[in-house]
Amino acid sequence: MPTQEAGLKLSGKYAIFVDYSHCAIAPLTLYLNYMETAYFNGKLLPRENITISPDDRGFLFADGVYEVTRWYEGFFYDMNSHQTRLKRSLRELRINWSDADLFPSVANELIKINKLENQHAMVYLQVTRGASRRSHSFPKPEVTPTAYSYAWGFTPDTKAMESGIKVMLKEDIRWSRCDIKSIALLPNTLSFQEACENGLKECIFVRNGVITEGSHSNIFFVIDGTLYTHPESNHILSGVTRKNILRIAEGEGIRIREEAVQENRIRFVKEAFISNTSSEVTPVIELGGNTLGDGVPGPVTKMIQNKFNLEIKALKG
């Protein structure tokens, strides 16, 4: 529970107002109220009443997975893919959470009970292996996983999506299972913090001379009219937005190559953009100090942005 100095006093309780506009990929303002209702181990509870064991392996080892999905004023975008990815991450970490199929219904209930139906919102779910005496080996017998989920409303700032962003390049110091949506994100946060402190909006990783992805985004390039992105592998997260961008691009007849781009080919890049659940499609106009194209969002990027937005509007009905 934050102290009075850390938050706003509301009816004797405390809330936190967080503005990430100085460094977020797509600047957004969110409001986390500790009087909101969250999901915890099968129950809906006020956030302030939730307690987690200090022996939880998520706390001790970052032994867990997470998923984030976006609510568009009436629906979740491609919830099925988020559900599939969640189950895969759980399998890869050998966490047996019996309620994994409930994620969509839990997410919908959190939106409803927190009265977020008519605005943009996000739902975060985290599942750890559970609480047990500290040991590098898995608990024997198995313990019940710890599941926590909450929702919050936000107002996207479209400036970055319209004007483009500048990003840095950095050697990829993460582990070799980036395909798992693990809560072990310290290399990502350290790298993103460095980008923020340098006035940049994202950190793009380079592994052995190959550009892989961002600290919390996938990245695409346009070279000679062809759309490039790193192929699915253990070095990138299979982004839900990434998958849908590839589908949209194919439908528009854009040439696609799921092929790694070498750092030394940046001089040939005419356009680039990043993608994730919260920032959708955000143009990159400067990469590692190199201005891309004319320094403004390019035609392929804007086409994909437009088609993505039209799809969202169509789903709203």
Summary of predicted features, one role per range:
Residues 236-239:
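Short, contiguous acidic and Ser/Thr-rich linear segments
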Residues 8-10, 28-32:
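Leucine-biased recognition of intrinsically disordered, low-complexity hydrophobic segments
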Residues 31-203, 207-210, 233, 246-317:
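Conserved alpha/beta cores of soluble small-molecule-handling proteins
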Residues 210-232:
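Glycine- and Gly-Pro-enriched alpha-helical subdomains that act as flexible
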